[in-house]
C-alpha cells in the first residue's frame, strides 16, 4: 500500500503553492474507470490518450483529489504540477526511499517475465508469500516500475 499523502504534503515536496484545503489519499490511480472513494487520480497524457479528459469522471467516482498539469483548469481538488509524468516519478522515488525490504531487479533482453515468475514462486515457497511482491504482467518499463513501487 502506498504511503498516505495529501495534496498539501505533495505541494510542499514539489515546491508548489500550498492548497487551501487538504485532501488525503493512499492510492494513485491513472484509469478513471478504476477510481474508488479516496483515491488520487493522476491525469497522465500519452500519444493516444489524455487523462485530463477524465478528471470530472474521476471526481464524480469519488477521487479525493486530482493531480493534473498546470495548464488544465484548477480548483480546490485539482493540484497542478509542471508534468504529471515527473510527478509520478517523484512519488515512486519517494515511496522507494521509505521501503526497507530487499529488492531484486531482473534485467536483460529476454526472459525477464519468466524469470520473475520462477523467482517469485521459489521465494514464496521459502518465505511468507504475503511478504513477496512480483509486479503483474510485464511491467518492465518506466511506468511499470513506478506503478509497482506505488502499489
Locate predicted features.
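N-terminal leader/targeting and accessory segments in enzymes
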Residues: 1-90, 94
